């Protein structure tokens, strides 16, 4: 059973969504977002941005500050979190089978968003920094997490559109089946429509302050000449 409906806002003159409906803003023009975002904030209405590419860094920073201050959930869709191989990797980490997490490494292909890769690193290990990112030599996003009991490696090959996940604990090595390269957007929208925000954010989705932190981390990575 859905808790609410989703309303796609793709034009500036749309009506304010009905009570309970969650708006997903897909407005490429800054002036249109400048019209809609204050309206939704004033109405204390949780909402989502369709993509991080559709919003400026300045807007992300301001949204993060506003959502914290007003305790208003603001999600940003089209993240990498719910791509199946990374979602399963998160399940492995949260299960505790790897023990205490102490390291994460994300290899970032040149053509891939460093911000979204940084968000993966922070999602898996909140203490991660730019040092946890490295430039990939091919078009694969490779994520390695190490805990006190073992290690897990997730690889998403963007060219072959294939994914793999392997877990090693002691002498035991296991390949975990994951769906191949599919969009995470459907899963993100399902979360928006089928769950209620907890502690002022939707579980699993990238929040505005997550995006702000990932931007800072990615900038440090790029400034250091690693991408």
Model-derived features: positions:
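A contiguous active-site-proximal alpha/beta segment in oxidoreductase catalytic domains
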Residues: 5, 54-112
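Short acidic low-complexity segments
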Residues: 11-21
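Beta-strand-loop-alpha-helix segment that lines the small-molecule cofactor/substrate pocket
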Residues: 22-79
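Structural motif
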Residues: 7-11, 25-30, 49-53, 78-79, ...
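Rossmann-like dinucleotide-binding domain that binds NAD(P)(H)
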Residues: 105-150, 156-160, 209-213
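A general structural signal for well-ordered alpha-helical segments in protein cores
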Residues: 33, 37, 60, 86, ...
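C-terminal helix-rich "cap/oligomerization" subdomain common to oxidoreductases
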Residues: 2-3, 21-31, 38-39, 72, ...
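NAD(P)-dinucleotide binding in Rossmann-like oxidoreductases
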Residues: 134-193, 200-205
């Amino acid at each position: 059973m859905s808790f609410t409906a989703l309303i796609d806002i793709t034009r500036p003159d749309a009506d304010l969504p009905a009570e309970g409906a969650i708006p997903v803003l897909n407005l490429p023009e800054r002036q249109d977002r400048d019209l809609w975002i204050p309206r939704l904030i004033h109405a204390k209405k949780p909402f989502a941005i369709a993509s991080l590419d559709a919003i400026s860094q300045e807007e992300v920073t301001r949204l993060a500050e506003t959502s914290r201050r007003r305790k208003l959930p603001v999600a940003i869709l089209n993240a990498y979190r719910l791509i199946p191989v990374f979602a399963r990797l998160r399940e492995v980490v949260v299960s505790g089978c790897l023990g205490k997490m102490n390291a994460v490494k994300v290899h970032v292909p040149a053509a891939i968003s460093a911000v979204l890769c940084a968000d993966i690193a922070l999602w898996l290990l909140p203490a991660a920094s730019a040092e946890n990112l490295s430039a990939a030599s091919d078009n694969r996003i490779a994520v390695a997490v190490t805990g006190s009991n073992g290690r897990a490696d997730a690889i998403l090959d963007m060219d072959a559109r294939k994914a793999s996940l392997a877990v090693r604990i002691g002498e035991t090595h296991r390949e975990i089946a994951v769906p191949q390269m599919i969009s995470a957007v459907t899963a993100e929208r399902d979360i928006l429509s089928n769950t209620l925000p907890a502690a002022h954010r939707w579980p699993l989705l990238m929040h505005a302050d997550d995006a702000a932190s990932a931007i800072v981390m990615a900038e440090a990575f790029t400034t250091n000449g690693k991408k």
